[in-house]
């Protein structure tokens, strides 16, 4: 009764479509809700499950802001908009819509190779069929609404219902790039609007995401030991620790230097933020001995190696990292799962040559693109399974 008592309000859309010349699937809602208009982006209500569904479809973390949401769409060749350009509506109630006027979908369809159209809910499907289908020439698949009001559909059911969206697009396969080209690519990403500190947060979150998945099904304590170096690879580890702690997984962050002693940026800022945010069950372990590291790893189900990154190209590893690597490898042989950030420490990401002391990982989460050393020479023996973390939309840049 309360909703019916509200007057109809005339709403103009105002949010531009997300697409580019690579978009192959067009996903359409009906009209932005008040929360979406407030957020100036699609599906802005915090309880709306649209972004959780897409993240689950592509096995990646849920995007946290509008830039990440647009990035996810473009990386997966998905265009996103709404059927209506304006209407009279009561709150967020599609059932109350009057005087609907459609968006000009040719803005998308004339520039992007869209092959399939999807509508997120029955109302969007009805308005598309009535107002847009004749002009577009493309019928729409009507998907269940991801709105929290559609409580009959659980998140797993929604993910399966939306799977045709993932099947309608061509996956992008990132190229193998030599380390100097990766450095240049990171600069190009920054110049395109995603600075290095943002990339680091995305990298650390993806690392934490993969570590949390690896813990699933393990029995016993869910505690993770994270080895953080002094550079930006270590920064990824600090961010991972921050997220894991936030998700309720205690971490022990092993570091040779306190966060305030670090000089590399954005690693220093990331470490300071992470250290300040850790809860009571987590801790920072500063400059431990090999014996103390052994005790930390005793019974630990999983460890993250974020000591040395893609810039390493030496025959030996300096102390104390060499000793920590030896202890970590012993723990690995005794059953601790090891996840490496970008490249196992002590392995050259360029040549695949391993130093005297090099981490043996079960999983390597490499950032942005694969590097040649992950598969060359000693690479396969040290990397384990390799997952590429798609932390930026790079297709126009490579």
Predicted ranges, named:
Residues 75-126:
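Internal catalytic-core helix/loop-beta-alpha segment
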Residues 29, 175-177, 218-227, 232-398:
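Glycine-rich phosphate/dinucleotide-binding loop and adjoining beta-alpha-beta core of small-molecule
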Residues 35-96:
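Short, surface-exposed acidic-centric catalytic microdomains
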Residues 171-221, 395-398:
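Positively charged, low-complexity intrinsically disordered leader regions
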Residues 106-110, 129, 208-216, 329:
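Generic structural signal for well-ordered alpha-helical scaffold segments
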Residues 1-20, 24, 46, 91-106, ...:
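C-terminal capping/extension of enzyme domains
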Residues 117, 139-157, 232-235, 312-313, ...:
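Phosphate/ribose-phosphate-bearing ligand recognition and processing surfaces
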């Amino acid at each position: 009764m309360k909703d019916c008592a509200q007057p109809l309000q005339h709403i103009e859309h105002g949010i531009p479509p997300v697409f580019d010349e690579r978009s192959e699937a067009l996903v359409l809602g009906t009209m932005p809700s008040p929360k979406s208009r407030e957020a100036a982006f699609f599906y802005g209500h915090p309880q709306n499950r649209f972004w959780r569904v897409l993240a689950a479809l592509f096995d990646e973390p849920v995007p946290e802001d509008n830039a990440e949401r647009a990035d996810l769409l473009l990386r997966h060749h998905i265009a996103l908009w709404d059927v209506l350009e304006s209407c009279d509506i009561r709150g967020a109630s599609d059932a109350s819509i009057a005087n609907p006027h459609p968006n000009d979908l040719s803005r998308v369809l004339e520039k992007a190779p869209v092959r399939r159209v999807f509508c997120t809910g029955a109302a969007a499907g009805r308005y598309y069929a009535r107002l847009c289908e004749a002009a577009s020439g493309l019928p729409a698949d009507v998907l269940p609404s991801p709105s929290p009001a559609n409580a009959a559909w659980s998140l797993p059911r929604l993910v399966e219902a939306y799977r045709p969206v993932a099947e309608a697009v061509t996956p992008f396969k990132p190229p193998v790039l030599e380390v100097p080209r990766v450095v240049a690519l990171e600069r190009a990403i920054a110049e395109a609007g995603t600075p290095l500190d943002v990339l680091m947060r995305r990298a650390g979150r993806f690392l934490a995401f993969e570590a949390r998945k690896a813990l699933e099904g393990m029995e016993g304590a869910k505690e993770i030991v994270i080895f953080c170096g002094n550079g930006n690879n270590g920064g990824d580890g600090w961010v991972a620790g921050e997220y894991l702690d936030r998700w309720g997984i205690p971490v022990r962050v092993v570091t040779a230097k306190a966060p305030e002693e670090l000089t590399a940026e954005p690693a220093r800022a990331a470490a300071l933020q992470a250290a300040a945010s850790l809860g009571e069950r987590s801790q920072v372990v500063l400059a431990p001995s090999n014996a103390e590291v052994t005790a930390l790893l005793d019974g630990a189900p999983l460890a993250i190696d974020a000591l040395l990154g893609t810039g390493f190209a030496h025959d030996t590893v300096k102390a104390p990292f060499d000793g920590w690597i030896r202890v970590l490898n012993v723990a690995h042989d005794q059953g601790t799962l090891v996840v490496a950030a970008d490249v196992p420490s002590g392995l050259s990401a360029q040549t695949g040559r391993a130093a005297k002391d090099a981490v043996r990982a079960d999983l390597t989460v490499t950032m942005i693109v694969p590097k040649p050393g992950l598969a060359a020479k000693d690479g396969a023996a040290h990397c384990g399974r390799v997952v590429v973390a798609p932390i930026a939309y790079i297709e126009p840049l490579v």
